[in-house]
Design a protein with these regions (language model features):
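Bacterial N-terminal signal peptides that target proteins for export
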Residues: 2-12
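Sec-dependent signal peptide cleavage junction
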Residues: 10, 19-44
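Short Lys/Arg-enriched alpha/beta "domain-start" segment
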Residues: 32-85
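Core beta-strand residues in small-molecule sensory/regulatory alpha/beta domains
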Residues: 88-91, 233-244
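Non-catalytic propeptide/linker segments at domain boundaries
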Residues: 95-152
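Short hydrophobic membrane-inserting alpha-helices and related fusion/pore-forming segments
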Residues: 177-196
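Short, low-complexity, Pro/Ser/Thr/Gly-rich segments in the mature regions of secreted, periplasmic
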Residues: 245-259
Length: 259
């Protein structure tokens, strides 16, 4: 009787071990599948805004990364052409210590300069092309360099031209307001609450690039010796990946210069 009980117990134990092993492998396989398909694993958590909201010229927020607490203070000028950011880390005594400062300067030629300075005064200046890559989606869109060429239209007929294109911007190691400034400069829209919220998502994910799909409509008028845009409407969808599977939000910009 004892031998039968032992054999029965051993059989049950073996079944449990086999089931546990199969279950563990199934979980591991599922994890591998998810990580290979979805590269949107968040790096920063508990993002909390203490002063201002994303899209404001002044912003103070805290977040956690790799078990440490950080604080960032940011100030931008009216047009978000210059963004000043200072980052702090909380020490063992619960006080914040400055670890670096950054200055983002968006230049008229479409590029930007990112200057990072550590606590020892060592600075590193990087020149960043905010429109890293641009490609047309429809055949009517002409790509010149890393920009979209707009064709002349006759405002007297109320003619609109619509073009769609995809692009990406390099945002590695940038803060929330700096990312918003880059996106605003790349698309040509105003930095506000919508772009600010999208920038926050990129920041939380620690994204290297911001990807977007743009539907751009405009009307141009001749103003000697050049042509100018008198009306424009731009709808942009932002993504975490180049395949445009994981959206971070949308933004709409409209301009009417007829008045």
């Amino acid at each position: 009787m004892v031998k039968k009980f032992r054999r029965l117990s051993s059989g049950i134990l073996a079944m449990v071990m086999i089931f546990s092993l199969c279950f563990t492998n199934a979980v591991q396989d599922a994890s591998i599948d998810i990580s290979s398909e979805n590269e949107t694993v968040g790096l920063r958590t508990q993002l909390t805004f203490l002063e201002g909201m994303p899209g404001d010229n002044h912003l103070v927020y805290t977040y956690q990364e790799n078990g440490q607490q950080y604080k960032v203070v940011e100030d931008a000028d009216v047009d978000f052409m210059n963004v000043y950011s200072t980052s702090y880390v909380m020490n063992s005594e619960g006080n914040y210590e400055e670890i670096k400062s950054q200055v983002l300067n968006v230049q008229p030629d479409g590029n930007c300069l990112l200057t990072s300075t550590d606590t020892h005064g060592n600075s590193n200046v990087s020149k960043i092309d905010i429109t890293k890559s641009v490609k047309s989606v429809d055949k009517s869109t002409e790509v010149v360099g890393a920009s979209i060429a707009r064709a002349y239209t006759d405002p007297g007929t109320g003619e609109w031209v619509t073009q769609t294109w995809d692009g990406s911007s390099y945002i590695y190691n940038m803060t929330v307001t700096a990312i918003g400034a880059v996106l605003g400069a790349a698309i040509g829209g105003k930095v506000g609450a919508a772009i600010g919220a999208i920038a926050s998502e990129y920041f939380k994910k620690g994204s290297d690039y911001a990807y977007y799909h743009v539907v751009d409509s405009w009307m141009m008028s001749a103003l000697y010796p050049m042509t100018v845009i008198i009306r424009e409407a731009t709808h942009t969808t932002y993504y975490l990946d180049s395949g445009h599977k994981y959206s971070t939000g949308t933004d709409y910009y409209e301009y009417d210069g007829r008045w």
